[in-house]
Amino acid sequence: MMQKRGTWSTVIGLIVAALLLVPGLAPAADSGPYFGIGGTFAKQDFDTGDLDQALAGTGLSADFDDTWGLSVKAGYKFNRYIAAELALDYLPGFEWNVATSVGGTPLSGEATVDVTAWTLALKLTPFDLQKVKPYFVVGGGIMHASADATVSIPGASASSSDDETDICGKIGLGVDYFVTDKVAIGLEGAYWAGFNDLEEIRFYTVTAGVAYHF
């Protein structure tokens, strides 16, 4: 029996030693800068109460489509638990299209909202699991939203546009998986909210990306 235990201990020890020697399984650096890029799916949660009120009686509602976008970030890890992150998120093409008839007159319309956000966030990693690093993120910054709308009836059309810039906030959670000690793939979910002139702009995001840690 003692010999069996010794044999299993030797085998397990050899496996652990082999895993530690694989470069791709080396633990990530505890501190230093990193740069990442990813693709984002954004699900709108716009506050369309005023627009819905204007559409009252038409049987229509302002139901904007979701969209896809791009996220670019640069950060610095102070230690294995805390990092600061600057990010640029570009989410074009939240669209609303409608085709109906009002009083027997055909009417069509479309509206598009494009969102760009620059944020500074605190990234907290409560568990040090070497390759797998779950985290919480909370931050704020500046959001810019541009809206274009067009309404058409036979023989006539009208268009309008608007641009607003104001503060915003985000909160979320995610996980980074270190493929090597330098390269990580990540998945993050977050909720965003604009404030003041952009209080109607709210949405959820899911971002998948890759980052290089120097």
Predicted regions and their residues:
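Cleavable N-terminal export/targeting peptides
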Residues: 1-31
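Gram-negative (and chloroplast) outer-membrane scaffold detector with strong preference
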Residues: 29-32, 36-45, 68, 72-153, ...
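A short pocket-lining beta-strand/turn micro-motif at the edge of beta-sheets
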Residues: 31-33, 167-171, 181-185
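Long, hydrophobic/aromatic N-terminal blocks
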Residues: 40-69
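Short, conserved structural micro-motifs that define repeat-unit consensus positions
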Residues: 71-77, 172-174, 184-186
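Substrate-binding/catalytic groove segments of enzymes
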Residues: 133, 145-149, 179-186, 197
